[in-house]
Swiss-Prot record:
PROSITE patterns named in the record: RIBOSOMAL_S17
Official protein name in the record: Small ribosomal subunit protein uS17
Gene3D superfamilies: Nucleic acid-binding proteins (2.40.50.140)
Upper taxonomic lineage: Bacteria, Bacillati, Bacillota, Bacilli, Bacillales
The protein's role, per its UniProt record: One of the primary rRNA binding proteins, it binds specifically to the 5'-end of 16S ribosomal RNA.
Signal peptide location: none
Coiled-coil ranges (or none): none
Family assignment from sequence similarity: Belongs to the universal ribosomal protein uS17 family.
């Protein structure tokens, strides 16, 4: 059980929900520049497994690392932190 707790957990925004049971999550992080010490924003997109197609475009979600589910999917949806408001 402790092995599962060592897996990476990220919070990001859903930028695509067009695929069946798959969402694309944009995760933004900050890293410090080695020479200048300035914080620089980095972003990366992760394909994430969404079993019930519950996450929608613009939602803030929590994802967790898991075993490879396909050629590009390595994460699964843990929870929807904040739902987006569609006007």
């Amino acid at each position: 059980m402790s092995e599962r707790n060592d897996r990476k957990v990220y919070v990001g925004k859903v930028v695509s929900d067009k695929m069946d049971k798959t969402i694309t999550v944009l995760v933004e992080t900050y890293k410090t520049h080695k020479l200048y010490g300035k914080r620089v924003k980095y972003s990366k997109k992760y394909k994430t497994h969404d079993e019930n197609n519950s996450a929608k475009l613009g939602d803030i979600v929590k994802i967790q690392e898991t075993r490879p589910l396909s050629a590009t999917k390595r994460f699964r949806l843990v929870e929807i932190v904040e739902e987006s408001v569609i006007i």
